[in-house]
Amino acid sequence: MYPEESRGSGGVATVDFLEGLMTMTAPTPAPTPLYSHSTTGCYSAPLDAHGPLSDGSLQSLGSGPTSPLVFVPSSPRLSPFMHPPSHHYLETTSTPVYRSSHQPVPREDQCGTRDEAYSVGELGAGAGGFEITKNTRFCAVCSDYASGYHYGVWSCEGCKAFFKRSIQGHNDYMCPATNQCTIDKNRRKSCQACRLRKCYEVGMMKGGMRKDRGRVLRREKHGPAQRQTSQNLPTHKASPQDGRKRAMSSSSTSGPGGRSSLNNMPPDQVLLLLQGAEPPILCSRQKMSRPYTEVTIMTLLTSMADKELVHMITWAKKLPGFLQLSLHDQVLLLESSWLEVLMIGLIWRSIQCPGKLIFEEDLILDRNEGTCVEGMAEIFDMLLATVRFRVLKLKPEEFVCLKAIILLNSGAFSFCTGTMEPLHDSVAVQHMLDTITDALIFHISHFGCSAQQQSRRQAQLLLLLSHIRHMSNKGMEHLYSMKCKNKVPLYDLLLEMLDAHRIHRPVKPSQSWSQGDRDSPTASSTSSRGGGGGDDEGASSAGSSSGPQGSHESPRRENLSRAPKGPGVLQYRGSHSDCTRIP
């Protein structure tokens, strides 16, 4: 479409477009020509009149159409908020040029400089005359374009609204399949249960909105080094371990308290934070016909455990000072205590129902129903021994303190076994543990008992933790045996936690050194009773899933390599090339 010009009187030019008429007043033509045939320069208006021109506002004389008016498009208008409305001028010369007076906005002043950056090439390059390269963030849930930082992660408007509806109202979704549905841009609406589960896995939480989000762009403007570092991060498909770490690595500003604030935090406030961090009681909504079979019960229990693990990560992030720990320490503490945390929660829910275990609101089992699963009768008997908790009349404040102590105390002596890396900041973990213990002592002191009775009750409560540790070891062995039988599905997060616990178990020196290192001094690793079961059983179980069995036991041991002195985790995956070390 070309505009047609009709010259009127008094220097008034009328431009006839398809949409209507536009009348403009043209300035007096210059007495001297603006262009010569010997040059190929481009027309440029005076700087004081129109300001600098962008590359898209320049037009060569030889490349334009034959119309007396040449329309030169301006730079692409991305948004009316980023680019002000353009004003057009009509120049009457020997070859009039119709151009836009829009001036390019400096990159530093554009909104979303960190999230969206556009670079416009020369006119005529690419389709439509422009080359536009767009670097933007993607939704952590469905991989669609992210609209902003919502509930602790970068997410799109759809996932943000879905998570908001879920935490405010109806959220008892049920997956019609196996709770492993693929959630992407095209299939995010197919399963609400798996979509909500993935929201929790990537780290979305109710209090995850950044307090300083209004000043992010201003801070990024003055910190180009940080912006360059964030842009250089590799973008690859996250593994399950990366997904769990990403779910636990949110902004530390969203967490309550910090290492410095813990020093001045009163015990009553610590108790309020611990009680507010408690996850809700789940509901399976799965209708299973009775009597239960082994596969039915284990399917229900593994599904319940996988959902509770997601809530447990959210619970841990709400503990005062937990987000100030390094990501390595957060993962290590959760991997070392996840089943103990789940079991003390199960005991607390079942404390008022003798002879029954309340796994979920609609999943209540007794001992007779648990006997159909091989090896579950002993675990049920230990779990049903909640009479010790009922006799002590455990209070909610004491329960939340014991639960936090289990998490923080799980990695306190990990360096003694030599099978896992120690905590990077054990001083901070010990400081958190002391704060929780002080809160427990503060609550006990308000019972109105004597000092001797207060000390006795504190000791009785802490002695319960050894009983929970013993149950956890038995439960871990049973879960691993069910995994080897491959009878029930183990979901990603539950399977990863289980494998991490097996890797961290101590092994015998004969299973750790290769035949070629006999002349070197060997270091014996202590065998802990907390691992549960014999070491020979643990080694054979580990080999059943990743290496040869039976008569191939000797080659499997020869493939193990000796670890040098120093912190490190030796992981064996079946061959000598797969034996890697995590620094």
From Swiss-Prot:
SUPFAM superfamilies: Glucocorticoid receptor-like (DNA-binding domain) (SSF57716), Nuclear receptor ligand-binding domain (SSF48508)
PROSITE patterns linked to this entry: NR_LBD (PS51843), NUCLEAR_REC_DBD_1 (PS00031), NUCLEAR_REC_DBD_2 (PS51030)
Boundaries of every NR LBD domain copy: 266-501
Residue ranges of the region described as Modulating: 1-138
Biased composition (Low complexity): 539-551
Keywords: DNA-binding, Lipid-binding, Metal-binding, Nucleus, Receptor, Steroid-binding, Transcription, Transcription regulation, Zinc, Zinc-finger
Subcellular location: Nucleus
GO function terms (MF aspect): hormone binding; nuclear estrogen receptor activity; sequence-specific DNA binding; steroid binding; zinc ion binding
Pfam families: Hormone_recep, Oest_recep, zf-C4
Region (Disordered): 220-263, 506-583
Zinc fingers typed NR C4-type, residue spans: 139-159, 175-199
Region annotated Hinge, chain positions: 205-265
Record has Mitochondrion as a keyword: no
Xref: Gene3D superfamilies: Erythroid Transcription Factor GATA-1, subunit A, Retinoid X Receptor
DNA-binding region: 139-204
InterPro entries hit by this protein: Est_rcpt/est-rel_rcp, Estr_rcpt, Estr_rcpt_N, NHR-like_dom_sf, Nucl_hrmn_rcpt_lig-bd, Nuclear_hormone_rcpt_NR3, Nuclear_hrmn_rcpt, Znf_hrmn_rcpt
Free-text domain note: Composed of three domains: a modulating N-terminal domain, a DNA-binding domain and a C-terminal ligand-binding domain.
Similarity field: Belongs to the nuclear hormone receptor family. NR3 subfamily.
Function: The steroid hormones and their receptors are involved in the regulation of eukaryotic gene expression and affect cellular proliferation and differentiation in target tissues.
Quaternary assembly: Binds DNA as a homodimer. Can form a heterodimer with ER-beta.
Protein's name in the database: Estrogen receptor
Gene source species: Oreochromis aureus
Taxonomic lineage of the native organism: Eukaryota, Metazoa, Chordata, Craniata, Vertebrata
